[in-house]
Amino acid sequence: MKWCVLMLALLQSLCCSGLPLYQSELASTADKALVVTMTQVNNLYAGLRLYRVTRGSIKRVVPLGLNTYDLMMNFGIKETDCLKSSGEDPQRCAFRVGFFVPAASCTARVRVTAELTQVVSLNCGQDSSSSESSSEENFTRKRQQLNVQPSGNRGPVLPGFSEATLFPSHSFSRQVEPQPIPRGDSIGNHLE
């Protein structure tokens, strides 16, 4: 009995509740976190069309205090037929069909409390199963950059980049032309 009280006191001092998050609670918490995350993706990153979740999993649950958790999530997204201006729920929209439909793999850290669900960080990059080729360029947004402004603006762009260079053609990656690397010797290229 003394051991249990000491263990509970230790867990409380380390800001852990010591109480497990049960599977049913985890599922509803993860669903709520995924909805908030997809709202952020569609508000900040999507072009003309909405994106929808294709797959998802919880990588890790980090307890921060009593009823406060950080969920580390992995999920995939793909563009749908619904226009962003339609106001439709993305989960009710059909996926676009085609060879070059944008898709991405994302990771997110979402803080869930009893009152609030907040995206702490979000990172999406070209999906490995996507048909687009070339080098990959990931985009990352941190908590202070994810605040959606009430005026409906898309939010701040990373310093040094314009929105056009970050998200050309409504895709999460851009094609980069390879630059010739000088050889460093005096022999010229006779094939030019």
UniProtKB/Swiss-Prot annotation:
Read off the SUPFAM superfamilies from this record.
Cystatin/monellin
| Residues in the signal sequence | 1-18
Q: Which domain of life is it from?
A: Eukaryota
Where is it localised?
Answer: Secreted
Q: Which UniProt keywords apply?
A: Disulfide bond, Phosphoprotein, Secreted, Signal
Question: Would you name any one GO CC term?
Answer: extracellular region
Q: How is it modified after translation?
A: Multiply phosphorylated at serine residues.
Which Cys pairs are S-S linked?
A: 82-93, 106-124
The yes or no answer to whether the keyword Amino-acid biosynthesis is present is no
Low complexity compositional bias: what residue ranges?
128-137
Region ranges (Disordered): 124-192
**Could you mention a single GO BP entry for this protein?**
bone remodeling
Family as reported in the entry's similarity comment: Belongs to the SPP2 family.
Query: Which function does this protein serve?
Result: Could coordinate an aspect of bone turnover.
- Protein name, per record: Secreted phosphoprotein 24
